[in-house]
Amino acid sequence: MDFALLLAKLPEAYQIFDPLVDVLPLIPLFFLLLAFVWQAAVGFK
């Protein structure tokens, strides 16, 4: 039962990380964009 109580309190504990969680899914898109820009810079060899 203590574990369930701990699990219930987690969202409050991680409230400060909400902006970070919003940004995390975008990171792979930034890598894709970076790869495209890099290939454009080297001339798509």
Curated annotation (Swiss-Prot):
One of its GO terms (biological process) is photosynthesis. It comes from the Bacteria. Signal peptide: none annotated. Residues 1-8 form a propeptide. GO terms for cellular component: photosystem II reaction center; plasma membrane-derived thylakoid membrane. It is found in: Cellular thylakoid membrane. The keyword Membrane applies. InterPro entries: PSII_PsbK, PSII_PsbK_sf. It is a single-pass membrane protein. It holds the Pfam family PsbK. Keywords: Membrane, Photosynthesis, Photosystem II, Reaction center, Thylakoid, Transmembrane, Transmembrane helix. Disulfide bonds: none annotated. The chain crosses the membrane at residues 24-44. HAMAP family: PSII_PsbK. Belongs to the PsbK family. One of the components of the core complex of photosystem II (PSII). PSII is a light-driven water:plastoquinone oxidoreductase that uses light energy to abstract electrons from H(2)O, generating O(2) and a proton gradient subsequently used for ATP formation. It consists of a core antenna complex that captures photons, and an electron transfer chain that converts photonic excitation into a charge separation. PANTHER family: PHOTOSYSTEM II REACTION CENTER PROTEIN K, PTHR35325. PSII is composed of 1 copy each of membrane proteins PsbA, PsbB, PsbC, PsbD, PsbE, PsbF, PsbH, PsbI, PsbJ, PsbK, PsbL, PsbM, PsbT, PsbX, PsbY, PsbZ, Psb30/Ycf12, peripheral proteins PsbO, CyanoQ (PsbQ), PsbU, PsbV and a large number of cofactors. It forms dimeric complexes. This is Photosystem II reaction center protein K.
